[in-house]
Amino acid sequence: MTLKEEFATRNFSIYGQWLGILSMILCFALGIANLFTFRVLIIILSAVCLASSFVILFIEVPLLLRICPTSSKFDDAIRKITTNYMRAAAYAVMAVVQWLTLLSAATSLLAAAVFLSFTCICYLLAGHQGPGLCRQQDPGRRRRRADDCMSGRARLPWA
C-alpha cells in the first residue's frame, strides 16, 4: 500500500502516527535550536520540548522499550499510553506546554505546538472513529489490511 493509498483510507490512527513522527522530529530540532537564548522560560520550555521528542519516540515505537535500557517506572508509564484517547491526552499535555512559550515570546517552538495539537486531534478522531489503535510496522509498509483496523480485528503488535 502506498502512502497515498494509506491517506485515502481516512484512518486517523495512521494519520496520528505520521504526525507523531513529524512532531518528534520537530520537537528534537526546535528544542535544540531554542536552547540558545537569554530568556529563561524559553530555555526551560525548549528543554521540555527536547525531552518530549524522546517520549514521543517511545510512544510511537514501542519496540524501543524492549531494546533500550529504561527504568521500570518509565516503561510502565509509556505502556499506559496504548489507546487512541490516551495518546491524544499525552499529545495534548505536550502541546499545552509548548503553547506556553507565548507567555514569554513568539518563538519557533510554536511550530512544535501546532504539530502536537494536530497529532492530538488525529488521535481524538481515531478514538471517536472506531475500535482501537491501528499501527504500521514502519512508515510506508503495511502490517495488516486497513479494513482490519476499521473493523476492530486488528491487534496491537506488542499485546
UniProtKB/Swiss-Prot annotation:
The portions of this protein that span the membrane are: 18-38, 40-60, 84-101, 105-125
Query: What cystine linkages occur within this chain?
Result: none
Tell me the membrane topology, using the record's own terms: Multi-pass membrane protein
Q: Spell out the InterPro entries in the cross-references.
A: TVP18/Ca-channel_flower (IPR019365)
Glycosylation: residue positions = N11
Q: Which cellular components does GO assign to this protein?
A: Golgi membrane
* Protein's GO biological process: vesicle-mediated transport
Q: Identify the keywords attached in UniProt to this record, alphabetized.
A: Glycoprotein, Golgi apparatus, Membrane, Transmembrane, Transmembrane helix
Q: Which residues form the signal peptide?
A: none
Report the locations given in the UniProt record: Golgi apparatus membrane
Asked if the Swiss-Prot or TrEMBL record annotates the protein with the keyword DNA-binding, the reply is no
What family is this protein classified in?
A: Belongs to the TVP18 family.
Question: What job does this protein perform?
Answer: Golgi membrane protein involved in vesicular trafficking.
Name of the protein this chain belongs to? Golgi apparatus membrane protein TVP18
Naturally occurring in which organism (per UniProt): Chaetomium globosum (strain ATCC 6205 / CBS 148.51 / DSM 1962 / NBRC 6347 / NRRL 1970) (Soil fungus)
Q: What is the primary gene name for this protein?
A: TVP18
